[in-house]
UniProtKB/Swiss-Prot annotation, chain A:
Catalyzes the condensation of ATP and 5-phosphoribose 1-diphosphate to form N'-(5'-phosphoribosyl)-ATP (PR-ATP). Has a crucial role in the pathway because the rate of histidine biosynthesis seems to be controlled primarily by regulation of HisG enzymatic activity. One of its GO terms (biological process) is L-histidine biosynthetic process. It comes from the Bacteria. Its EC number is 2.4.2.17. The lineage of its organism: Bacteria, Pseudomonadati, Dictyoglomota, Dictyoglomia, Dictyoglomales. This is ATP phosphoribosyltransferase. It catalyses: 1-(5-phospho-beta-D-ribosyl)-ATP + diphosphate = 5-phospho-alpha-D-ribose 1-diphosphate + ATP. Keywords: Amino-acid biosynthesis, ATP-binding, Cytoplasm, Glycosyltransferase, Histidine biosynthesis, Nucleotide-binding, Transferase. Heteromultimer composed of HisG and HisZ subunits. Belongs to the ATP phosphoribosyltransferase family. Short subfamily. It is found in: Cytoplasm. The keyword Cytoplasm applies. It comes from Dictyoglomus turgidum (strain DSM 6724 / Z-1310).
C-alpha cells in the first residue's frame, strides 16, 4: 500500500478525483471530514498544503500531490517526479498599473508569501529588495502601501483586477506535481514508477 | 559506548582492507563554499569550521601510481537556521586511477561493515555521471547546463524537463526513459549507442557486485541519479536504510585537482554517523563488559582479577561501592 498525502483547500477535489483514476476503492469513500481514506492501492492522507512537503520529506507518507509553487518555495529533500494535469496557476509579479518594474536604484518592497522564490528570482535583478512576508491576502501590500509590488500565484487574475492591480510579469507556470520521499523512491521504486507510467498515459490523454 | 563501539567496528573492517586513518584540521583557511558555513575572522583572515572532510583531504594528497587507501572520522559543522549543527562524518577513499576493482572494493567494504553491525535491510542506488555528461553535451548554454545539473541533484525532474526545453524529441524521449527507467519494459529502448553503452556499463557493474556477494534486491540502477559536487566522474551511489527518512550517505568515482595542481582520481564513500546510530540495533553494539563493584580500599586486591579479565579481551571496569548509592 502506497501512502499518499493530498492537499486540503482548492486542489483537494481534483487530487482525489485524480487518484480515483488509479484506485477504484477510493470511489466508495465519502470524503466528509476524514483525514485518512483507505483505498485498495493507496492510503490517502489529507494535509495542509504548506505542511505536505514536510510529511513527504519525513517519510510519514511515500508520495504527495502538491503545487509546484510550494515545492520551489520550501526546497525540501524530495523527488519531484512528474507534473499532473490540474492545479494550473502562474507565479507572477503584480502591482498597480503606474508602478514600474525598473528599479532605478531604489529599494523595491515586495509583499509575498513566497520569500525564497522571490529572493531567488528577483534579488539579483534589482540588487536591493525588501521582502515583506505575508501569510495571505498579499494584495493588501500595495493597497496599504507597505509594498510596491507583490509576488503571488494567480489562477484567473480576478482578485488582482478587483483590487486594481495588474500582472507585470509571469515568473513561472505551476501545476500540481507528484513528489516522493527519497527513501520510499528507492524501496518502492517499481510500484512508484509503475504508477508514474499510468500517470504519463493519463497525461498524454489530457494533452 | 554505542558510538565508540560502532567506530571500532568500522575502523577494524577498514584496517583489514589496508586503509589508514588520516586526520585533518577542523579549521579551514581556504573556503570553497559559503552557504551554511560558520566563519571566524582573525587579523583580517577568514577561517571556517569544516563543513565536510572528503574534499579537504583530497586537496592535500599527492597522486602516485600505487593505490592509496585512507579513512577518516571527525566532526563537521554547518549552520541550520541560527543553530550550529555538529555531526560526525565517517568516510573512506581509495585513490587510484579509474578501474572497476577500485569502485567495487569501496562498495564491498560498505557491505561488510553492514554485515559487521547487523544491518541487512539496505539499498544501494547506482548511477553513472557519464550518462548525463552525454545528455548535457547537447545543451550549449553553460548557465543552463549548470541549472539543469542542479535540478538533477535536487531530483526535480519536472523543472529539468521544463528548463531543458528540448526541441530534439529523440533526446527528450531518452531523458524520460532515464527518469522513469524501471517503468519501461520492452518499450524502453535507448536509441543513442553511446547512451546505451553507459547504461549497459551501469547494469554490468551491478551484475559484478551481485557476483561478488551482494543480494540482487539490495542494488538498484537509477540512471537519473546525480550527486552534488561536479568532481564526480563515473559510477556514483547513494545508500538507504529501511527505516530512514533520507539517504545515509553516498559517494562515487571522482577526479579532483589537489593543491599541487595534479589530477587526483579516486572512489569514496562518506556518511554522517548520527544517521546510522539512529537506526542500528542497539544489542549488537553491547561490548562484553565486567563491572567490579567493590569498596574503594579493595581496589589493589581486585586489580589482579581485572588484569586477568582484560588479558582475555574483556573490558573490566572498577566501580567504588558506596553504600546507599550502589547495592
Amino acid at each position: 500500500m502506497i501512502r499518499v498525502a493530498i492537499p486540503t483547500g482548492r486542489m483537494l477535489e481534483q487530487a482525489l478525483d485524480f487518484l480515483r483514476n488509479f484506485d477504484d476503492r477510493l470511489l466508495d469513500e465519502e470524503k466528509g471530514r476524514k483525514l485518512r481514506i483507505h483505498g485498495e492501492r493507496f492510503e490517502v492522507f489529507l494535509a495542509k498544503p504548506w505542511d505536505l512537503p514536510l510529511y513527504v520529506e519525513e517519510r510519514v507518507v511515500d508520495l504527495g500531490i502538491i503545487g509546484r509553487d510550494v515545492i520551489w518555495e520550501q526546497e525540501k529533500n524530495v523527488v519531484n517526479l512528474i507534473s499532473l494535469p490540474f492545479g494550473y496557476c502562474k507565479m507572477v509579479i503584480a502591482g498597480y498599473p503606474y508602478v514600474s518594474l525598473k528599479g532605478n536604484g531604489k529599494e523595491i518592497r515586495i509583499a509575498t508569501k513566497y520569500e525564497n522564490i522571490t529572493k531567488k528570482l528577483l534579488e539579483n535583478r534589482w540588487g536591493k529588495i525588501k521582502i515583506i512576508k505575508l501569510n495571505g491576502s498579499v494584495e493588501l501590500g500595495p493597497i496599504l502601501n507597505i509594498s510596491d509590488l507583490i509576488v503571488d500565484i494567480v489562477e484567473t487574475g480576478k482578485t488582482l483586477r478587483d483590487n486594481g492591480l495588474e500582472v507585470k510579469e509571469v515568473l513561472f507556470e505551476s501545476s500540481a506535481c507528484l513528489i516522493s520521499n527519497v527513501v520510499s523512491f528507492a524501496y518502492l521504486r517499481k510500484e512508484i514508477l509503475s504508477f508514474v507510467k499510468e500517470v504519463r498515459k493519463l497525461n498524454d490523454k489530457c494533452n | 559506548m554505542k558510538r565508540e563501539s560502532l567506530e571500532k567496528i568500522i575502523r577494524r573492517r577498514l584496517e583489514l582492507w589496508g586503509y589508514n586513518e588520516v586526520r585533518i584540521p577542523i579549521l579551514y583557511e581556504d573556503i570553497w563554499g559559503k552557504e551554511n558555513l560558520i566563519y571566524f575572522e582573525k587579523n583580517g583572515k577568514f577561517l571556517a569550521l569544516r563543513p565536510e572532510i572528503t574534499r579537504e583531504i583530497l586537496k592535500s594528497i599527492r597522486y602516485d601510481k600505487i593505490p592509496k587507501r585512507m579513512f577518516y572520522m571527525g566532526p563537521i559543522f554547518k549552520l541550520n537556521g541560527r543553530e550550529v549543527e555538529e555531526n560526525y562524518q565517517i568516510g573512506w577513499e581509495l585513490i587510484y586511477k579509474p578501474s572497476l576493482w577500485r569502485d567495487v572494493e569501496v562498495l564491498l567494504i560498505i557491505k561488510e561493515v553492514f554485515e559487521d553491525i547487523g544491518i541487512d535491510d539496505y539499498i544501494i542506488e547506482l548511477g553513472n555521471t557519464k550518462i548525463w555528461d552525454f545528455i548535457l553535451r547537447f545543451i550549449k548554454d553553460e548557465e543552463k547546463v549548470k541549472s539543469l545539473r542542479e535540478f538533477l541533484v535536487k531530483r526535480d525532474y519536472v523543472s529539468f524537463l521544463e528548463k531543458s526545453d528540448l526541441s530534439n524529441s529523440e533526446l527528450k524521449s531518452e531523458i524520460l526513459n532515464l527518469f522513469y527507467y524501471d517503468s519501461c519494459d520492452e518499450d524502453c529502448v535507448f536509441l543513442n549507442s553511446s547512451l546505451r553503452d553507459e547504461i549497459n556499463f551501469l547494469n554490468s557493474f551491478k551484475k559484478l557486485l551481485v557476483k561478488l556477494g551482494f543480494k540482487e534486491d539490495k542494488l538498484i540502477v537509477n540512471p537519473a541519479l546525480m550527486r552534488p559536487y561536479e568532481y564526480y566522474d563515473g559510477i556514483i551511489f547513494e545508500v538507504y536504510l529501511k527505516n530512514s527518512k533520507t539517504s545515509l550517505g553516498g559517494g562515487g568515482s571522482y577526479i579532483e585537482r589537489n593543491k599541487y595542481n595534479e589530477l587526483l582520481y579516486g572512489f569514496g564513500f562518506a556518511f554522517v554517523e548520527e544517521k546510522l546510530l539512529e537506526l542500528v540495533n542497539g544489542t549488537f553494539l553491547e561490548e562484553n563488559i565486567r563491572y567490579f563493584v567493590y569498596p574503594e580500599e579493595q581496589f589493589i586486591r581486585i586489580y589482579e582479577d581485572m588484569r586477568k579479565e582484560r588479558e582475555k579481551g574483556i573490558i573490566s571496569v572498577f566501580i567504588p561501592k558506596d553504600e546507599g548509592v550502589l547495592e
